[in-house]
Curated annotation (Swiss-Prot):
Single GO BP term: thiamine diphosphate biosynthetic process
NCBIfam families, alphabetized: PRK09355.1 (NF006830)
Pathway terms, separated by semicolons: Cofactor biosynthesis; thiamine diphosphate biosynthesis; 4-methyl-5-(2-phosphoethyl)-thiazole from 5-(2-hydroxyethyl)-4-methylthiazole: step 1/1
Alphabetized InterPro entries for the sequence: Hyethyz_kinase (IPR000417), Ribokinase-like (IPR029056)
Protein name as annotated: Hydroxyethylthiazole kinase
Record keywords, A-Z: ATP-binding, Kinase, Magnesium, Metal-binding, Nucleotide-binding, Thiamine biosynthesis, Transferase
EC number of the protein: 2.7.1.50
MF-aspect GO terms: ATP binding; hydroxyethylthiazole kinase activity; magnesium ion binding
CDD domains xrefs: THZ_kinase (cd01170)
Annotated gene: thiM
Cofactor(s) named in the record: Mg(2+)
Species of the source: Rhodococcus erythropolis (strain PR4 / NBRC 100887)
Amino acid sequence: MSDTVSVETVASAIDALRDQVPLVQSLTNIVSANFLTNVLLAAGASNAHIDNVHEAGGFAAVAGGVLVNLGTPDDGTAEAFLISAEAARTAGTPWVLDPVGVGGLPWRSGIAVDLLRFHPSAIRGNASEIIALAGLGGDTRGVDSASDSADAVPAALSLLTHADAVSASGPVDYIVGRDGGGDVRGIRVSGGSALLPRVTSTGCSLGGLVAAYLAVTPTALDGLVAAHTHVAVASEIAEENASGPGSFAVAYLDALYTVNADTIRSRARIESFDLPAGVQN
């Protein structure tokens, strides 16, 4: 049975997203830029792809949320990542770190660790990336995960010293973070579609959606749960109307657009899970 409180929180968040239409600054990779923008527009937000060193910091200070995605970094964008993260931190703009490929590629792994000093509001990655970022090993295969999302929970908890909330995505998404009362909670979001990893940029675009939800929710934990749930429900609906990856990609955008608070109430599967012994609240 779904956690009723969490479901209602997500239902309220999706209404807030459509009402406020937050503007996300996405410093993302060249593979995902177009699809990420379409995902944000379909869901109810908007996007600006500002990743040059001259404008990135100024824009981060006024955006609703910022995404820093390490998918295809170069010297210029790496500097813009740091500038944007520092500006967001200073201005109080929520920002998301998506540590794509961390663990398997040393240079970007160093960039990701450096970014942690600016305390991302949320970290979103697959299980291998979360484990690697926490310094606990991890088996990263390109941008794909070779670890189960449940196995990343200890690593995600350790990253709460650097971020307000952390998610490890997979067939089931595991999310940890502090609630409005300051207590650490674990939330599991089920659903989704096996076709998601067959379409490029679905994971990277989730990072953008997290940034959008952070702009309209009271805690980073709420924002992560809302974004993951929106994607889980929309992709499940999309699969019902698709015959393969191509038609799924189109159906997914349509479903992100049509999912509303009532859809969340009827289809979301959100559960609390017990944290390992010794977790301090």
